[in-house]
Amino acid sequence: LWTGSTTERGAYQNFGDIFIDFGAAGGNNPRGPVDYRRELDLDDALAKVVYKADGVTYTREYLASYPDDVIAMRFTANKKGKIGFTVRMDDAHTGGQRTVTGNSITISGKLTLLSYKAQLTVLNEGGTLQAGDSTLTLTGADAATLLLSAGTDYDPQSPDYLTRSDWKGKVSTVAARAGSK
């Protein structure tokens, strides 16, 4: 994502920020975790955090998949019903739109030349997922996977740098396809 025009390049822009509050939903925001361990596997693009709190072992895994075009976050616990959080995604740009429907939060907008869309989808195993005005709140789940997909209408082969394909639909399709794996 960048600002600029067809004749002048602008600056790189991020899509936005994802905020996950594990305490707001009565989730796994422990007081004084023990056996805290972080791992980074560069070969598999996997980051992992494991810790114990109140007799429960929590695992958080983060994976960036180029073939699937998603970033995946997976939260698990060794006891049922212990995963809970509130998540929101904020657009980094003024004038963008955020929508929360079903199990997804979407941000979209237009910069000087490029249009963009990012979608965060929550796939919960058990528990209850509730949509708010700007958040999704999960309570009492056994596990949860969050999938982030994003795209723009940029096409470097096009004379005006804009694609004619259904790039917005692809963002939603990518998350659905990755969620089925």
Predicted regions span which residues?
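Aromatic-residue-lined binding/catalytic grooves and analogous aromatic/hydrophobic interfacial grooves
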Residues: 1-181
